[in-house]
Amino acid sequence: EADGAIDSLPQALALGYDGVSHKNCKGMVKGLANAATLAEEERNRERAVHLSGEDLANVGPIALFQDLAMMAALGISHVERNGHHYFKGLSAWPESAQASMLENHDDLYRAHPEGYPTLGIKDGMLDLTSMNAAPFGPRELLDLSSLVRIDTDDPTGFISAGLPAD
């Protein structure tokens, strides 16, 4: 949680910590720099170093694909995923985008009983077969024409964007 500055990991290592957890929200380049720092550190110490991964509030489809790709690039195969607990799957996305995810990535997403796509977690795992077959994002470009423009100068509208009306 404390990996907020570019020098956080070197400071933690100097204090005796053994690693860091990557979060895409902290920056992908920072994650690569941390991985390089840990690789160098491991060459100069007897005790192992650790690079883990976590996602607190990652909402698919686009951000999830980026996060999964980054974790794979860093060699992190076990990721703490919490984002799917805080949001109603892809319910905030246009119906066309939801349908596209269920049609083209039915291994990664499943239909929630209320109809919207949600992560299809099976035995703690995500099936990435369709994602790996579409390495540059969703198999089908998402139709975003029905997204509502948000007035970022109005904090109330910005904060409530994507939240259910009820």
Task: State where each predicted segment sits.
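Shared catalytic-loop signature of beta/alpha-barrel
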Residues: 3-127
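Extended hydrophobic packing segments that form well-structured cores
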Residues: 112-166
